[in-house]
């Protein structure tokens, strides 16, 4: 695991050093460089496997192929045996070297053979080509930009790319619209105009002639309606067991998050089976009513883990700029940053439960909404069954009213997938200026359209597909990677194993969401392994609400930063709207607006770090430095 950076088409050793230094936190255990007149590569190493000989770059036998790499290929031992039979000679015990020899044998076709998380840059000196590639799901990030002379810069983090003085730091208006509407930026765009993500399951080839991008994998959702429940349980158990066992490979101590929820408890159960010593487990608490210590203890006791309860005390806004600095974009979810900060005090590899919801139907309310709007009588899977225990009648009716106005399933989903059921066109008239409206080139729903064109699938199954391809890689996985690597921790995600993904997307919706119960098949599978209070436990979240935050700190911070901030001064957001929300008495019915204010505060901090300075540099990241 590490951070990578580099460029193709020119030489600049000081720039390469600066790009590497910018992502030092991703790999504090070592650094390595590869340079020639065509390409320059840098690696920061967080040593996990083969601690003695695993330094990068790593080469093939004649050193005509060089690689810098971020991630883990969990099936590398199987790949190595196959390659050795074909005559390849290995000099290390790393998974990195398996990539090099796989490329020699299969070219870019090797990518489909890798089971793991990865982003890498591989230079072939014989072909004078640079190959960039990213894993199927987008677990590991990779960003790039193309300069005027057709040269290419790439890195694990955008701050490394910004070390080049010719890279423009401009806000992308479409990305800003997506961020305001969804809280994340889908697709290839980032908040920086001209700096792109390499999409999951894609590769890029840079040569002296051009830059080409290709897709080596996409999710196939062929549903097997014939599978019965018992067969599905048996297959899922076998795949889960193998996935967790593969992801136990490490030359340093490894642990697992344990919230007491279904996903982490499942991982701990299988990891304990695969380990010859007590597993290290961690449960975090923030002094909230939703702290999960009680549930985690049940699982820790059952599997006799080496369990730690970490009570995190924090000032919510104190760490806010640091979190934004590490993720290179406006975000407001601080919990992962604080969690990984605590984990790093104990170890540097940990299993996360990420992906369980996306594969097995954890977001029940979203799927209920989609089935509701797609049914002819509006009664099928009425989401009120689920939502009336979460929202007031007024909030529920507001959400349904917005969704009913949607012109397409994709537009409805764009409302549903945003945490606040989205802003509709009427609301945006008050929020956006005419300038902002004129700069938006396509609707937010356009990012979801292709996933709802799939014929022969239920609305819920189409939503599963969109969830996996859009929100998971562009929101959850970006946060997971940035916040773990900010603290030099490798987060592994067993649910996002190749075999598990393929199998779970062949399951019919009835085995994922059944009678209002999400992750039905996983609950059934674990019912004879986990205590009932865990296997039947519903999804839980943090209790801090934006409404309570608005009453305490958010109103004052928003008042300080927004009325005279970039978005108002440059006429993206209407000042009257902001002042109206700030003047109104705090009320739960205004939660959607408070969420927006919090997003805008995050944007202003991001802008103050990345766009406003005449020259990009790491600034003072104390919250006071962003307040007037």
Labelled PLM ranges:
Residues 472:
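Phosphate/pyrophosphate-binding loops and the adjoining catalytic core of nucleotide-dependent enzymes
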Residues 87-94, 169-173, 231, 454-467, ...:
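Structural motif
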Residues 83-91, 108-110, 162-170, 189, ...:
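Short, polar/flexible loop-turn hinges at active-site or ligand-entry regions and domain interfaces
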Residues 7-18, 37, 85, 105, ...:
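ATP-dependent adenylate-handling active sites, centered on carboxylate activation for C-N bond formation
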Residues 94-98, 518-525, 537-547:
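Polar, surface-exposed loop/tail segments
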Residues 79-87, 443-459, 505, 571-590, ...:
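Short amphipathic alpha-helical segments and their helix-coil junctions
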Residues 1-72, 101-221, 237, 241-245, ...:
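N-terminal glutamine amidotransferase
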Residues 530-588:
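PAPS-dependent sulfotransferase catalytic core
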């Amino acid at each position: 695991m590490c951070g990578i950076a580099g460029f193709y088409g020119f030489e600049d050793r000081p720039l390469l050093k600066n790009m590497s230094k910018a992502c030092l936190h991703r790999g504090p255990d070592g650094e390595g460089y590869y340079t020639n007149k065509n390409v320059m590569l840098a690696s920061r190493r967080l040593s996990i496997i083969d601690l003695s000989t695993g330094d990068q770059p790593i080469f093939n036998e004649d050193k005509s192929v060089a690689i810098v790499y971020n991630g883990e290929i969990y099936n590398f031992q199987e790949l190595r045996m196959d390659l050795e039979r074909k005559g390849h000679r290995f000099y290390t015990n790393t998974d990195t070297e398996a990539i090099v020899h796989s490329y020699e044998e299969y070219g870019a076709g090797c990518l489909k053979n890798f089971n793991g998380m990865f982003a890498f840059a591989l230079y072939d000196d014989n072909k004078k080509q640079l190959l960039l590639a990213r894993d199927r799901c987008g677990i590991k990030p990779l960003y790039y930009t193309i300069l005027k002379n057709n040269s290419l810069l790439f890195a694990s983090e955008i701050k490394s790319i910004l070390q080049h003085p010719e890279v423009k730091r401009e806000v992308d208006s479409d990305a800003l619209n997506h961020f305001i509407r969804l809280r994340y930026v889908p697709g290839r765009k980032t908040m920086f105009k001209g700096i792109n993500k390499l999409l999951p399951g894609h590769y890029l080839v840079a040569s002296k002639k051009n830059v080409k991008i290709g897709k080596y994998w996409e999710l196939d959702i062929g549903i097997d309606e014939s599978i019965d429940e018992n067969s599905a349980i048996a297959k899922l158990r076998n795949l889960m067991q193998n996935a967790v066992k593969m992801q136990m490979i490490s030359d340093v101590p490894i642990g697992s998050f344990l919230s007491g929820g279904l996903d982490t408890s499942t991982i701990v159960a299988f990891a304990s089976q695969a380990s010859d010593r007590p597993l290290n487990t961690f449960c975090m608490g923030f002094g909230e009513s939703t702290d999960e210590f009680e549930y985690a203890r049940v699982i820790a006791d059952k599997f006799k883990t080496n369990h730690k309860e970490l009570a995190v005390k924090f000032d919510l806004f104190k760490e806010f700029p640091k979190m934004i600095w590490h993720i290179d974009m406006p975000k407001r979810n601080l919990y992962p940053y604080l969690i990984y900060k605590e984990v790093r005090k104990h170890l540097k590899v940990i299993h996360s439960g990420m992906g369980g919801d996306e594969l097995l139907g954890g977001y029940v309310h979203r799927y209920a909404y989609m089935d509701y709007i797609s049914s002819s009588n509006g009664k099928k899977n009425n989401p009120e069954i689920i939502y009336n225990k979460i929202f007031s009648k007024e909030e529920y009716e507001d959400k349904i009213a917005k969704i009913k106005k949607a012109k397409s399933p994709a537009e409805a989903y764009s409302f549903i997938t945003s945490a606040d059921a989205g802003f509709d066109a009427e609301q945006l008239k008050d929020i956006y200026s005419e300038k902002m409206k004129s700069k938006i080139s396509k609707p937010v729903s356009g990012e979801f359209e292709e996933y709802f064109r799939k014929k022969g699938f239920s609305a819920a199954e189409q939503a599963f597909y969109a969830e996996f391809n859009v929100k998971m890689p562009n929101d959850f996985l970006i946060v997971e990677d940035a916040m773990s690597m900010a603290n030099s921790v490798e987060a592994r995600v067993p649910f996002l194993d190749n075999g598990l993904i393929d199998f779970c997307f062949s399951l019919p919706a009835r085995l994922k969401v059944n009678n209002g119960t999400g992750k039905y098949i996983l609950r059934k599978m674990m019912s004879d392994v986990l205590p009932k209070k865990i296997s039947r436990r519903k999804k839980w979240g943090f209790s801090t609400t934006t409404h309570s935050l608005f009453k305490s700190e958010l109103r004052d911070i928003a008042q300080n930063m927004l009325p005279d901030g970039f978005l108002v001064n440059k006429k993206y957001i209407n000042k009257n709207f902001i002042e109206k929300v700030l003047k109104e008495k705090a009320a739960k019915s205004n939660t959607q607006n408070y969420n927006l204010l919090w997003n805008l505060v995050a944007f202003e901090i991001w802008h103050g770090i990345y766009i406003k300075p005449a020259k990009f540099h790491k600034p003072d990241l104390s919250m006071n430095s962003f307040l007037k």
